[in-house]
UniProtKB/Swiss-Prot annotation:
Function as written in the Swiss-Prot or TrEMBL entry: Associates with the EF-Tu.GDP complex and induces the exchange of GDP to GTP. It remains bound to the aminoacyl-tRNA.EF-Tu.GTP complex up to the GTP hydrolysis stage on the ribosome.
Pfam families xref list: EF_TS
Primary gene name: tsf
Keywords: Cytoplasm, Elongation factor, Protein biosynthesis
Keyword Methyltransferase: no
A single GO cellular-component term on record: cytoplasm
Single GO MF annotation: translation elongation factor activity
UniProt-annotated stretches for the region Involved in Mg(2+) ion dislocation from EF-Tu: 79-82
SUPFAM superfamilies: Elongation factor Ts (EF-Ts), dimerisation domain, UBA-like
Keyword check for Cytoplasm: yes
Organism: Bacillus licheniformis (strain ATCC 14580 / DSM 13 / JCM 2505 / CCUG 7422 / NBRC 12200 / NCIMB 9375 / NCTC 10341 / NRRL NRS-1264 / Gibson 46)
Name of the protein in question: Elongation factor Ts
UniProt cross-references to InterPro entries, sorted A to Z: EF-Ts_dimer_sf (IPR036402), Transl_elong_EFTs/EF1B (IPR001816), Transl_elong_EFTs/EF1B_dimer (IPR014039), Transl_elong_Ts_CS (IPR018101), UBA-like_sf (IPR009060)
Subcellular localization(s) per the UniProt record: Cytoplasm
Family stated for the protein in its record: Belongs to the EF-Ts family.
Length: 293
């Protein structure tokens, strides 16, 4: 497979490795991006790649709760300027109210539903696009439910650039639930606990760590012990309950939750634009385009 400059660029952005190292890794793995990342990590050239990819699109997240139902949603716009527009914020609120009331199963299902104003969600968004003058999309949402003995934790960071909604069972302490949501916003765990990590992922990480240790020239008789220690650190990076609590790093999140006789049922974290590629433009050209207007 031919290795293109764009592939090398993408691998560099994901790993921070040098151009020649990236080209060599892609060549050795026949252009397989995931395998190239693993190969660079095994050689100690690249750090663990988080699958967040580049943050690109603009917009806002919003969270609303009503009794035992909560919704978190993300609506995208083309520019940050529009995301701060009052008309955009009104649309965000209206969509949240509709989803909270009607609980559609998907974005596609929501688009065809009638709103309180008589128009469908799709028609309402199209109307907003005509007024605001930018493409606007309802990207995603999650509707969460809880019992009477549980608490929602809602946290918006930077006015809605990151939104987190948590559910804690066994407590009605919304402040603690919000603290956990704030922690999730800051640290971005992928799982609640270790038992949610697939055996395949754990084994893959163990193999990478083993190769790293061997590359460092460590004796084989201590490699296994080293690998387990490093694997524990890996779990601390990706599992919420194993992490040091952001408000008090001397405590683990699981200790904070246990102190309330509670358990973390679930969490949803949205970061505006994560995984969406933004159109790349030359900055000098962009400035000149603005000057010419």
């Amino acid at each position: 497979m031919a290795i293109t400059a764009q592939m090398v660029k993408e691998l560099r952005e994901k790993t921070g490795a040098g151009m020649m190292d990236c080209k060599k890794a892609l060549t050795e793995t026949d252009g397989n991006m995931d395998k190239a990342i693993d190969l660079l990590r095994e050689k100690g050239i690249a750090k663990a790649a988080k699958k967040a990819d580049r943050i690109a699109a603009e917009g806002l997240t919003l969270i609303k709760t009503d009794g035992n139902t909560g919704v978190i949603l993300e609506v995208n716009s083309e520019t940050d300027f529009v995301a701060k527009n009052e008309g955009f914020k009104e649309l965000l609120n209206d969509l949240a109210d509709h989803i909270l009331a009607e609980k559609p199963e998907s974005v596609e299902a929501a688009m065809g539903q009638k709103m309180a104003n008589g128009s469908t969600v799709e028609e309402y968004i199209t109307s907003a696009v005509a007024k605001i003058g930018e493409k606007i999309t309802l990207r995603r949402f999650a509707v969460l439910t809880k019992g009477d003995d549980a608490a929602f934790g809602a946290y918006l960071h930077m006015g809605g650039k990151i939104g987190v909604l948590t559910v804690l069972n066994g407590t009605t302490d919304e402040e603690t639930a919000r603290d956990i949501a704030m922690h999730v916003a800051a640290v971005n765990p992928r799982f609640i606990s270790r038992d949610q990590v697939s055996e395949e992922e754990a084994n893959r990480e163990r193999e990478i760590l083993t190769q790293q240790a061997l590359q460092e020239g460590k004796p084989e008789n201590i490699v296994a012990k080293m690998v387990e220690g490093r694997l524990n650190k890996y779990f601390e990076e990706i599992c919420l309950l194993d992490q040091a609590f952001v408000k008090n790093p001397d405590e683990k999140v699981k200790q904070v939750v246990a102190a309330k006789n509670a358990t973390v049922e679930t969490f949803v974290r949205y970061e505006v634009g994560e995984g969406i590629e933004k159109r790349q433009e030359n900055f000098a050209e962009e400035v000149m385009n603005q000057v010419k207007k």
